[in-house]
């Protein structure tokens, strides 16, 4: 019996708070929870419940994250908040909390600070598509001109990293005052919620994206041909569809002549399902684990890319020593390890466990990839890092 399907009447959107330490990310998270629960119904979460973030493990990396949910009249939001800067870095790089949009919190008493910049850069690198600014602690600034100055600074900083700094919404408010129930500041939280609704477009569901299945196994069935198995990552494949086999070697085209799930024949395989795909005229040796089956033209194989990487600390089971240029680990994409070489940024001689770093990777064979694809860095099967493809070079 298949599990009951998770049906929601309203569209579901993933967001999160980012910004410098002590600028009020967690207070804002609590304020949104309270004001929206009070206005539209739902359960309010307190600061202490959010601040006490449970520890999670994502690909062997320990991350502290708080997840809360809230509703506006038109949408359901899942919101992530992290206690420490390192948690943000890990969260964004591993994709543990994929964000459809982020709320950048900037204290108007301080203006943009080092982590403000770093979180904007990370958002750009890992592909957070939209940023909305909440200028916090505005109740503590009497000077209107000072607020304007801070807003200008934040907008310029966002433009510097290719976000539309001039056009994105900036809300001036006070999370603490809103949490204390002061109507003029509660109104600012509702303004922020309205900005989330209008500025972040409804995300495309996995099922509506072009078909892609990472190949895990290949079988030959006498009299029927070759079957590849795996979990459909996105889209739908139907019997009779033309598909491409991409990665590792030259791309080839074939046709899906059958879809099987739990030994039953189906007309189609959909995102999230584990299935076997029968391929016309394909030999057992033409396909291997590590390739993907995809809608023709939807994804290309690449070998060289810029990435943002988090290197596991010794405590997380990572390396005990730094690595240098010339380091040649394995890069694990979807279902397979590929050896690659790295190029460190100018002036960087070595990378310490626990660091995050931008690096250019060149693989020894091509892998089907898009910007935003996550990977692990491994040494002999042990994970020592996590990364994301920021920009494809070749």
UniProtKB/Swiss-Prot annotation:
The UniProt record lists the tr-type G domain at 10-204
Tell me yes or no: is Magnesium among this UniProt entry's keywords.
yes
Region described as G2: 60-64
Tell me where it resides: Cytoplasm
Task: Provide the residue span(s) of the region labelled G1.
Answer: 19-26
Give the EC number: 3.6.5.3
The annotated region (G5) lies at 174-176
PROSITE patterns given for it? G_TR_1, G_TR_2
What Gene3D superfamilies does this protein map onto? P-loop containing nucleotide triphosphate hydrolases, Translation factors
Residues noted as binding Mg(2+) in the record, renumbered to the chain: 26
Q: Per UniProt, what is one Pfam family of this protein?
A: GTP_EFTU
GO cellular component terms listed in the entry, alphabetical order: cytosol
Ranges for region G4: 136-139
Q: Where is this region: G3?
A: 81-84
Annotated residues that bind GTP are located at: 19-26, 81-85, 136-139
Give the quaternary structure: Monomer.
Q: What name goes with this protein?
A: Elongation factor Tu
Origin species, per record, is: Shewanella putrefaciens (strain CN-32 / ATCC BAA-453)
Identify the taxonomic lineage of the organism of origin: Bacteria, Pseudomonadati, Pseudomonadota, Gammaproteobacteria, Alteromonadales
